[in-house]
Design a protein with these regions (language model features):
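PAPS-dependent sulfotransferases, especially Golgi type II membrane carbohydrate sulfotransferases
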Residues: 81, 88, 99, 103-107, ...
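PAPS-dependent sulfotransferase catalytic domain
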Residues: 55, 60-143, 178
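Basic side chains
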Residues: 32, 37-38, 71, 115, ...
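PAPS-dependent sulfation machinery
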Residues: 1-54, 58-59, 183
C-alpha cells in the first residue's frame, strides 16, 4: 500500500546466537544438552510424520524435551508476510495451520514441554534462562546467565505495524487467540483489533 511503500524490502534474515566468552560448536567435557531452533520447520516435519519425536529419542537414547516459544501472533504473522512478500491474509491462514498442528502435537506427545513467551523473555531474560536451566537440570551459574542475557534484544519488535491489515485479518487473529490456550496471554492486547495505521 501507499502507506508502507517507503519501507525497504526485508533482508534475508540471519541470527547470531554466539554467547560472548563461551564455546560455539565445541564443548569441554560431556555434552548435557543438544538443541536446535527450527520453529515452523519443526512443526511442518512433525505434521508430516508424528513418529519423529519417538524416532529421535530412539536414535539419541535420551529423552527429548520440547521448548515452545510463543510470540504475539500479530507480530509473527506480519513478519511471515514481509519475509515471503505475501498478503497478511495468506499468512493468517498459514499461522492458523501452524497452531492447529502445534496443538495436535502437544496433545498427543508425552514429552516434557517448557513454554516461553517471547515478550516475557525479552523483558526478563535472566529469569527465564535461569528457569529453563533449572527445568533442564543444568547448573545455574550467574556469569553464564548474564552472558546469555547480553545478546537478547532490549525490547520486542512490534512488526505488526509494518504490514497492511484488513479488518477480517484481525478478527481471525482474535479468534485464534480465544481458541488456543498458548495464545491467551495476548487477549488483553487491544492493538490487535484497533491500531492507528495512519
Amino acid at each position: 500500500s501507499q502507506r508502507l511503500a517507503h519501507l525497504p524490502t526485508p533482508e534475508p534474515y540471519r541470527f547470531d546466537y554466539a554467547i560472548p566468552g563461551y564455546f560455539q560448536g565445541r564443548s569441554e567435557g560431556g555434552i548435557r544438552v543438544i538443541g536446535d531452533k527450527k520453529g515452523g520447520g519443526t512443526t511442518k516435519l512433525l505434521a508430516q510424520d508424528s513418529t519423529l519425536l519417538e524416532k529421535l529419542e530412539s536414535t539419541v537414547e535420551m529423552p527429548v524435551d520440547l521448548i515452545h516459544v510463543i510470540r504475539d501472533p500479530c507480530d509473527n504473522i506480519s513478519t511471515m508476510a514481509r519475509r515471503t512478500g505475501t498478503r497478511v491474509s495468506r499468512q493468517v491462514s498459514r499461522y492458523e495451520w501452524l497452531c492447529e498442528e502445534i496443538g495436535r502435537i502437544l496433545d498427543s506427545c508425552d514429552n516434557r514441554v517448557f513454554r516461553i513467551h517471547h515478550e516475557e523473555f525479552i523483558s526478563s531474560p535472566s529469569q527465564v534462562i535461569e528457569n529453563l536451566f533449572t527445568w533442564l537440570g543444568l547448573s545455574v551459574e550467574s556469569d553464564h546467565i548474564a552472558a546469555c542475557s547480553s545478546i537478547v534484544y532490549e525490547k520486542p519488535h512490534r512488526s505488526r505495524s509494518l504490514s497492511d491489515w484488513e479488518d477480517g485479518d484481525r478478527d481471525s487473529v482474535e479468534s485464534m487467540i480465544e481458541r488456543w490456550e498458548f495464545l491467551r496471554e495476548y487477549q488483553s492486547d487491544e492493538s490487535h483489533a484497533r491500531e492507528d495505521t495512519g
